[in-house]
């Protein structure tokens, strides 16, 4: 897969200023929006090493036909413009936070003459005050039922309110004093609005004021020997305390903050938020997002803050954005985010990572919830038997297979200009990753323009040659056993003895043709082959002129994407290690005055080249036999190695 020549901007045409850029497809539709402190540096990163890009970034670049940008003066302006464009275009490749479920809110319709309290879901409406979200709607109804004793605001629908107004008779709640019955004029407009605003104030955390007020009224009633009224007020106080007890106290009474934590893996991320008002947890919410590109946790935090707080209406920003936002990782452009949030709120907003105390403990709780949300989401999609069965059935139907492919093997090639070419093989059985079966290959003979295709032919040939050899060996062992061979010896199945039902290759028609040709040359006819191209996620079959397009919501497509992305991750991690090993080894070999004895001393002292590369010149000079001048030379040479290549070895099988 390559980048379209028309997509790559001319050298020097991209400015170095901050700005926002848009990728468009061949129909002119915006498919991705991003921002950058330096447009030239950011956009150039998309056109360097295509194979090293995140799988979904490769898909985006392959789909794009054009890119344009807008220069701005500050990073704050870039953040604002990025949010505006994402909201306007809804680009398919931008991160989109979606709920694991539709969370209910307690809503007060302050935009109405007589505000109503109700349960609301979905998009926010202008002029409505929201509290929550809550995990369950019944929790809201229980809370409202208790609060109506003290704040008898209406909960009826517009139709019921209109009928009561016409008939002059209130509903049942009006008769039992759980509604002030504005429909029949028992309370004036201004007095009723004050009552609704008191309800909102209590829900916002101003609990102490109302408790003190009611306690004073109860004492006055008792002193005046109005014992029935005092008893009613006592019950009102108990109702408020019951509501407060349901909301755990976690921080100081004056603390208003949102606590945001992100848990992530290679493909997805989960965000969990606890809403703290008046020191109490007033609500919580979780999102799950597909990672479109290889973004940092700080960038995910920044994108989440922009999408979450950017959606608040200007008139509601003061209440939607708290004074303090606690995050698990600092936003990528913290100063710009803080300035933008402060401008929207109309007052200072502090965005920080808590380091100690109660806030740090609460952050760890929120992070644990985020990890559980991600695990629950992945389990639901990947481990649920019904979902897995559906995915495998969809794949079988789309590819015309006689039965579901219970064992899928996916192969991916990773190379850089034909050097250090490697391949990966990942295995999914019954829709689940079987990591003990993963294999990796160092490609021996793939060079030149068609190295990717040649490498695919080689790895398929090697894998299935081993299959034929080992299956024959297993047959010979079975024959020996039947003829009286010694019993009791452990018989462990060879690593390549089991064939897959389906081979998936990362690529389009050329890669699929190479894989099929390798199988044909070996005389293997009972293994199906398909390829998943990054462009538009097309599924290619051998000998077909046109690809198969699975629906984007298809569980079968989701499983194929997971298999392909896992193969890509496994291949590229091995490729980086191999390339880094070769590069660092050659650097040590080329350093003047550094012979075998000194190299051995360095490795013995630091344990590995990677740790040596992380050491300072002074630390290197502490090694016996290494002077300050040699240490400085070693330090300068090793620090020139690309940082992205210093990856930790992955726990996997040895090269095949």
Swiss-Prot record:
The keyword Aminoacyl-tRNA synthetase does not apply. Keywords: Cytoplasm, DNA damage, DNA excision, DNA repair, Excision nuclease, SOS response. Residues 16-95 form the GIY-YIG domain. Its main location: cytoplasm. GO terms for cellular component: cytoplasm; excinuclease repair complex. GO terms for biological process: nucleotide-excision repair; SOS response. GO terms for molecular function: DNA binding; excinuclease ABC activity. It holds the Pfam family GIY-YIG. Gene3D superfamilies: 5' to 3' exonuclease, C-terminal subdomain (1.10.150.20), GIY-YIG endonuclease (3.40.1440.10), UVR domain (4.10.860.10), UvrC, RNAse H endonuclease domain (3.30.420.340). InterPro entries: GIY-YIG_endonuc (IPR000305), GIY-YIG_endonuc_sf (IPR035901), GIY-YIG_UvrC_Cho (IPR047296), Hlx-hairpin-Hlx_DNA-bd_motif (IPR003583), RuvA_2-like (IPR010994), UVR_dom (IPR001943), UVR_dom_sf (IPR036876), UvrABC_protein_C (IPR050066). Residues 208-243 form the UVR domain. Coiled coil: none annotated. It is found in: Cytoplasm. CDD domains: GIY-YIG_UvrC_Cho. Belongs to the UvrC family. Interacts with UvrB in an incision complex. The UvrABC repair system catalyzes the recognition and processing of DNA lesions. UvrC both incises the 5' and 3' sides of the lesion. The N-terminal half is responsible for the 3' incision and the C-terminal half is responsible for the 5' incision. HAMAP family: UvrC. NCBIfam families: PRK00558.1-5 (NF001824), uvrC (TIGR00194). This is UvrABC system protein C. It comes from Thermobifida fusca (strain YX).
